[in-house]
């Protein structure tokens, strides 16, 4: 069973080991962390640079074996009542155990009950069907909005999704 706790500085060393190839890196980060490979220092810098912001909440999911997942919740701009998932990733060894679904459900619960959000959003790339199906399984629906990113000289289309309280 998974639990959540706030991200700690040393968590970045474990999290970056889950990003094993360039494709995974860009699906996870949209390139917001620079180029592959990502270092623990670069992830830590990105997270800690925003952690004091009252609208940015990084979490790790853990079980008895240690941390198994990571994500952030943030308020996009000045949109009150809305939080957005970002940097959602699961330890590859934990996949297939329902941990992705559990982690998202815990994050949604935090967003609605602790932070008072009425809507939670996220974006997922079309070329990431396993993540898309996981998001749908916890109740996210497409909201009709999408963006196209130029990643590795290819156009990657994102699908915006949301879940409302």
Which residue stretches match the model-derived regions?
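Acetyl-CoA-dependent GNAT
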Residues: 6-12, 17-95, 104, 110, ...
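Glycine-rich phosphate-binding loop
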Residues: 98
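Alpha-helical segments that scaffold the active site and NAD(P)H-binding pocket
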Residues: 105, 136-137
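C-terminal "cap" of GNAT-fold acetyltransferases
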Residues: 83, 118-121, 125-131, 137-141, ...
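Residue-level detector of family-conserved "landmark" positions at structurally sensitive sites
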Residues: 29, 104, 121-122, 145
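Extreme N-terminal starter segment of soluble prokaryotic enzymes
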Residues: 1-3
